[in-house]
Amino acid sequence: MTITQVKIKKLENFSGSLPEYATEHSAGMDLIAANEQPITIKAGAIQLIPTGIAIALPDSFEAQIRPRSGLAVKHGITVANSPGTIDADYRGEIKVILINLGKEDFIIEKGMRIAQMIIAKYERILWEESSSLMETMRGSGGFGSTGV
């Protein structure tokens, strides 16, 4: 497995620990809330939650912000734009867009694990316009065409 070093900056509102892998085979690192005061996410509402960190990803890398399964299943708290994308040239604070799909208001306390971040390599492409595409068995079938 290749290890890539990424620069991370603690901002003024940072508290707690840097994102880290929970187990040897974890794909994601937990992101920690860095809000000064508790933030209430009302049922059905969306809130932007600060993490107190900024990162400098190498070229051809992105950070994906994804929900934590425990928050989703127990409280209906998930990432509204999942996965959120942090581009390699972004240098601002990483913030997480959380939505409360539950029936009860939910309070985000400082230091709470609110999402997970996955660092992923990607490739850029060039479009090649074509008047036709290679046929496949699936063709244009989508939205459940291969079964439920």
UniProtKB/Swiss-Prot annotation:
Enzyme Commission number(s): 3.6.1.23
GO terms of biological process kind: dUMP biosynthetic process; dUTP catabolic process
GO molecular function, one term: magnesium ion binding
Positions in coiled-coil regions: none
Catalytically driven reaction(s): dUTP + H2O = dUMP + diphosphate + H(+)
One Pfam family here: dUTPase
UniProt-listed NCBIfam families: dut, PRK00601.1
Family according to the record: Belongs to the dUTPase family.
The protein's name in its UniProt record: Deoxyuridine 5'-triphosphate nucleotidohydrolase
Origin species: Rickettsia massiliae (strain Mtu5)
